[in-house]
Amino acid sequence: MPSIILPPKPTALQKPHINLAVVGHVDNGKSTLVGRLLYETGYVDEKALKEIEEMAKKIGKEDFAFAWILDRFKEERERGVTIEATHVGFETNKLFITIIDLPGHRDFVKNMIVGASQADAALFVISARPGEFEAAIGPQGQGREHLFLIRTLGVQQIVVAVNKMDVVNYDQKRYEQVKAEVSKLLKLLGYDPSKIHFIPVSAIKGDNIKTKSSNTPWYTGPTLLEVFDSFQPPQRPVDKPLRMPIQDVFTITGAGTVVVGRVETGVLKVGDRVVIVPPAKVGDVRSIETHHMKLEQAQPGDNIGVNVRGIAKEDVKRGDVLGKPDNVPTVAEEIVARIVVLWHPTAIGPGYAPVMHIHTATVPVQITELVSKLDPRTGQAVEQKPQFIKQGDVAIVKIKPLKPVVAEKFSDFPPLGRFALRDMGRTIAAGQILEVKPAQVQIK
């Protein structure tokens, strides 16, 4: 049976490439909207979709068909039908867009942190349905948490889809109310809401996604796909040393070890000698593949599978980083970072031990010292060696990883210099690395 989501067409790979994070609260319609986007851009297998629609009809849940596209794709992936990590993509007139980390994953917020560090742009999905909207941006709302995260991770390009407009009868007043509240939140985070597109959509009915809807005559702006076309692809840092955080590793019979990840900086070519750290194992690149197509070389932004000779699967794990022996990725003994405390019930002091999520790695860490507290607006120090910091504070801190992990200065390698601290199932803080004290690494 064909995969429900089609691989990129040859035309797609000629276009500039953008990684899109789809964020928002549970049940606000992210999966349905992604399914709809894939369908509208010709990336859903018609035969497989018909099967799904018939199944949905049988149980009286026709509205579920688009969301089920992703469910079906996830099942295929779990059964090993598709290798691609968690990436699906679609094409607009000007761009090829990869959706990173599909919504609905139980570790979505955690993945958001690792995933969004790869995002060039974000689609924020918010439901106009009374009750759902308020829950999403309330103090406990995931919608709110996701916006804080994409801000901290440096995502500048955002579009807001005000979804489920069909449920509120395409009421302009409700749309304006949602827009005003979300704008307030965006402003608080330092975005300029006047530069962000808000679009009234219905993922289920298809309003304003590919074509202008007659149901919203009061809306004169662009469609969702038109806004995507206005996104600027990032400058890809090809001239920096190679860094590729590893997302996954597996063995293919007859081929050997394959590591999957996204090239963040530098260039990787077939035949290159590479090193994977912290384990400090050296190997050679046999082949590189992206979306089932062979590549001679990979550049920043490429999501790839790399067949490595000389390195065993058990020597490598998610969170390790692939580089070159002449510029080995830095394993951190200690880091100095600027953090913002997003949520904490009491206060944080020296000795606090959360879990750090950095690129694709997850490690236990300890805050060893609070160096200074900063004024969030100016970035100037207002207090040296504070005893504690609390929610809303910005501070410079020293952090010691309790297990080996690769970490780089944010100014050198942004994707490897951004992190989140988590505890109690919540994101406590997000930060940027200012200094790294390197650990000794013996290349084997």
From Swiss-Prot:
Coiled-coil portions: none
Binding positions for Mg(2+) per the UniProt entry: S31
Alphabetized UniProt keyword annotations: Cytoplasm, Elongation factor, GTP-binding, Hydrolase, Magnesium, Metal-binding, Nucleotide-binding, Protein biosynthesis
Stretches for region G1: 24-31
PROSITE patterns assigned: G_TR_1, G_TR_2
Domain of life: Archaea
GO cellular component: cytoplasm
The protein's Enzyme Commission number: 3.6.5.3
Renumbered residue ranges of the record's region G3: 101-104
Domain tr-type G: 15-238
Molecular function terms from GO: GTP binding; GTPase activity; translation elongation factor activity
Region: G2, residue numbers: 80-84
EC supergroup of this enzyme: hydrolase
G4: annotated segments: 163-166
Function: GTP hydrolase that promotes the GTP-dependent binding of aminoacyl-tRNA to the A-site of ribosomes during protein biosynthesis.
Name of the molecule in the record: Elongation factor 1-alpha
Gene: tuf
